[in-house]
């Protein structure tokens, strides 16, 4: 094992990326700052080579739009991406996990999935616009989870998934694997 270089350590703590090992960290809620940092790190790693990338996740969820940006970046990466979830893969974090080529969970990690929550105010017409947008996002969420679940459980229905998403559904690492939402427990 080579000795850590000071600039590699600084980059790791400042930006959540360790270039020599092609590892990214996702350890805060999904917001604009985390998303921008993650997207830059992934872009740098993708630009340097197509070698595999590992993402270390401990994510409680957050903003859907920033999460979808991360999801799309991982899904379209030219590199094989493995996400290792430690602690949390909750809400938007569980959705992001589905973008990876390989989805791993630590034995004590917890996954939680649900439809997102929004607050809207204003004239009825404006609230309807937000409701329609939330329904669109819910369909995108279903399309991320459902194929993964069906691969593991061919008889699982979209209605069953929708019932799970109507409330907070917590899964252990082993339950996540059994549901098809993770590939294996570390």
Which functions belong to the PLM regions below?
Residues 1-186:
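N-terminal organellar transit peptides
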């Amino acid at each position: 094992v080579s000795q850590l270089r000071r600039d590699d350590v600084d980059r790791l703590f400042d930006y959540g990326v360790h270039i020599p090992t092609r590892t990214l960290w996702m350890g805060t809620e999904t917001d604009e700052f985390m998303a921008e940092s993650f997207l830059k790190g992934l872009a740098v790693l993708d630009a340097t080579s197509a070698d595999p990338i590992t993402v270390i996740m401990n994510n409680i969820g957050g903003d859907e739009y920033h999460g979808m940006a991360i999801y799309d970046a991982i899904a379209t990466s030219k590199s094989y991406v493995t996400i290792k979830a430690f602690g949390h893969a909750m809400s938007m974090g569980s959705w992001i996990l589905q973008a990876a080529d390989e989805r791993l969970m630590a034995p004590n990690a917890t996954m939680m999935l649900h439809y997102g929550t929004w607050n809207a105010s204003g004239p009825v017409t404006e609230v309807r616009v937000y409701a329609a947008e939330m329904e669109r996002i819910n369909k995108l969420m279903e399309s991320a989870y459902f194929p993964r679940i069906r691969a593991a459980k061919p008889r699982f229905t979209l209605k069953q998934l929708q019932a799970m998403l109507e409330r907070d559904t917590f899964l252990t690492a082993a339950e996540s694997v059994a549901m098809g939402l993770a590939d294996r427990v570390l």
